[in-house]
Amino acid sequence: MPAKSGGVNIPVNARKTADTACIQRITLYPIKSLDGVSVAETRIAPGGSLEHDRAFAVVDAQDKFVNGKRFAEVHRLRAHFDLDTHTVTLADSGMSAPQGFRLDRDLERMEAWMSTFFGFSVTIRQDPRAGFPDDTDASGPTVISAATLATVSAWFPGATPQDMQLRFRTNLEISGVSAFWEDRLFGEPGTLVDFNVGTVAFEGVNPCQRCVVPARHPRSGIEESGFQKTLAMRREQTLPAWAARSRFNHYYRLAVNTRIPPSEAGKTLRVGDEVTILGVRRANDE
């Protein structure tokens, strides 16, 4: 049966391609704004996020996020996670001895360590149900293709696809498709793109608006002059025909924001799962 948008039937295969899109990498960011960890599989949390993704967040005395947008020092903070043992090891880019913490019982000690690192008092919040997404209207994982990361890295001398993955901090990386294939996962304003990843239902919402963080070196925090301008210019020049250009009030956008319906809670995403586009519908056609 065709999907519907604005009363007009849109063939389900209108957005399908000959490519076989599969999940190549799943990256979780257990503490918002800190380093990620790659996993082979993850479950869907009750609030529609990936389990463990941004389940913790560091906030200041005004209860505002301590993140890379506000504090470049975040980029110097290294975090290594072992989700099986609920542990994180923190270090100041090798300048101090690494310190290990249990995420299930050492939060006060970790708050003290981070307060010393930042030079002001911080608190660690926890929300295992929904996490702390930047976009609360599209709180699912962000999606990008490996080919996109490779193409974008070529726009910046000396950069690699891994550099771009660290800068853009996406959750799901897709292989087997061309650059900017993920732009098929959103439609015109007021629409959603239904797609499946394995057995998990997704809704593609919009192209992800980027902040200052990708313009900074992911380890030093030093801002790269002209990064935002170059990315926006090249995105506009290379925007594929299948992308809904009306969603770009500016072109400093990369990757796709998604939602996962409540019905999918508890299901599992795995590396190797196929991504299948089902069709486009109006956002209010539930």
Residue ranges and their predicted role:
Residues P2-E286:
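Metal-cofactor-dependent catalytic cores
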